[in-house]
From Swiss-Prot:
This is Cytochrome P450 monooxygenase roqO. It is found in: Membrane. Pathway: Alkaloid biosynthesis. The keyword Transmembrane helix applies. It is a single-pass membrane protein. GO terms for cellular component: membrane. The indole alkaloid meleagrin was shown to be a good candidate to control c-Met-dependent breast cancer proliferation, migration and invasion.
Length: 503
């Protein structure tokens, strides 16, 4: 999923969080009609579009497929937060770097960014680009973070799953969320807070609470929103959570500043976005706490969603467990625990990418806002002010993916052996037929950290535990609105095993 769409939905527990965020990002603005597009869920006399919104909520996937079957390459959909334009993936390459389409403007003013407690995007030149810059810097440092991330995966997994050699039951959702939160916190704010229970609770729940607050505010007329948020309990709760985050984080940052200024400060200190952003600011005024909450918001829940889906697929196809385990043993026996070792886990990447192909976070991808009117090469015109997204349809194209509805864990492994397709097989590689991370200059910059975290989690699980779906029941897959999600109540039966190699 790209920069704009780093949130995915969850209608139980974690969920309402991300769903609302993506809705807010892309769907609130009205559609400007300078070209007529077919609307797939418009109805006569549906003045307030309530029927259309209900239809989208329950049948978005069918509406999109029906439009594509009719040969439509551009069409409208009414959602419960506005009307937007859906483009077929064939246009993604043409538009992927078009400066007239803005990822940032797809956020601006939509998710109440200027209300106190909700301003995770900030204002001003520094805040508008500091977080993506920090992520790009972190990507360059991932080679040095592998051991630290692995240590946190080991610690959390031992805490959650224990060393018991007897079969026992654990929650997939709770396990993965805790793992990703701890590992991501290690990369973002360093060792001091990555095992701090209170900070980890904030890292997991801030996005959820913020989304609930936005939903509560948006239930009021827009003219009252700048006032009503002061009185809504949900908004008050978010502001309290932010204040608590400041109380925890700022002393850590101050100690980091003092360490960095000491003459004996080690030059091989492990990277964190906390210190990077502080140095990047060069004394400019900025909100360090909100910067970290923003990074966390676009990282923890999305990565967790992806890993949960991969684990569910492996449980559906237990025949993959031994080949995956053998690959992990072979790679780490010969290469040790290094970032380059993770790149050699090609079967694991194939399983991850195939899972993501069939179960992306959202049905549609690459959310954008048109700053100017855009005319495509085939004459299709996108009016200025349009909020749009791509249909994510090529991921199920039988000409590109034989038997596209069937999960094939070896699909992208085989692709690596084809010289014409090998470069498109890696998990982090974007392409028009695989838009889960977006495509072009706004493709998700955090996908490299997400990939490394997912691999390390799977490596530790495969080496240290036997696991299977509880009573053979794999978490159900749900599609609601534009969001694709596994049931968060899924359980695993696990037991400790003797690993062949130690990470």
């Amino acid at each position: 999923m790209d920069v704009v769409a780093r949130f995915m939905v969850s209608y139980s527990g974690t969920a309402c969080a991300i769903s609302l965020f993506i809705f807010g990002i892309t769907l609130l603005f009205p559609f400007h009609k300078s070209q007529s597009f077919v609307c797939m869920n418009s109805h006569s006399w549906d003045i307030f579009r309530n029927k259309a919104k209900r239809e989208f909520e329950s049948n978005a996937e069918k509406l999109i497929k029906d439009a594509l079957r009719k040969g439509l390459t551009a069409f409208q959909l009414v959602t419960n937060m506005g009307t937007y334009l859906i483009l077929a993936d064939q246009y993604a390459e043409e538009l992927r770097n078009d400066k007239r389409l803005s990822a940032y403007d797809a956020l601006n003013d939509v998710i109440l960014l200027e209300l106190p407690g909700l301003e995770t995007m900030f204002q001003g030149s520094l805040h508008n680009h500091v977080s993506p810059t920090a992520i790009h810097a972190m990507n360059r440092e991932l080679v040095h973070l592998t051991r630290a991330l692995s240590d946190e995966a080991n610690h959390r997994l031992q805490t959650q799953w224990t060393d018991s050699s007897e079969w026992h039951t654990v929650s997939i959702h709770d396990t993965v969320l805790a793992l990703v939160a701890q590992m991501t916190t290690r990369a973002f704010v360093g060792a001091e807070l990555c095992r701090n229970a209170e900070w980890l609770d904030i890292a997991i729940n801030f996005t959820i609470n913020r989304a609930i607050a936005v939903q509560a505010v948006q239930a009021w007329p827009w003219i009252l929103q700048p006032v009503v948020h002061w009185f809504l309990p949900t908004c008050k709760a978010v502001r309290r959570q932010i204040q608590r985050a400041r109380t925890i984080l700022m002393p850590v940052l101050e100690r980091e500043r003092q360490t960095m200024h000491r003459k004996d400060s080690s030059s091989d200190r492990i990277f964190s976005t906390l210190t990077f952003i502080d140095q990047y600011a060069q004394g400019s005024r900025y909100d360090a706490t909100m910067a970290q909450l923003r990074l966390t918001a676009v990282s923890v829940l999305t990565t967790s969603d992806m890993v949960e889906k991969v684990l569910a697929r492996i449980c559906e196809h237990p025949e993959l467990i031994q080949p995956l385990r053998e690959e992990v043993v072979s790679v780490f026996e010969s290469s040790g625990l290094h970032h380059k070792s993770l790149l050699k886990l090609t079967l694991m990447e194939s399983v991850m990418k195939e899972s993501q192909r069939l179960e992306p976070a959202t049905l549609i991808s690459m959310f954008r806002a048109a700053k100017k009117t855009v005319t495509l090469q085939d004459g299709t015109t996108i009016p200025k002010g349009t909020r749009l997204a791509f249909a994510n349809d090529l991921r199920l194209d039988p000409e590109l993916y034989p038997d596209p509805e069937t999960f094939d864990g070896y699909r992208f492994e085989r692709m690596r052996k084809d010289p014409e397709q090998a470069k498109l097989a890696p998990f982090t590689k974007t392409r028009t037929s695989h838009l889960a991370f977006g495509h072009g200059k706004h493709a998700c910059p955090g996908r490299f950290l997400s990939c490394d975290e997912a691999k390390l989690i799977l490596c530790h699980i495969l080496l240290k535990y036997d696991f299977k779906a509880l009573d053979g029941r794999v978490p159900d897959l749900h599609v609601r609105s534009m969001f694709i999600q596994r049931d968060t109540g899924g359980m695993l039966s696990v037991r400790r095993r003797q690993e062949e190699v130690t990470l």
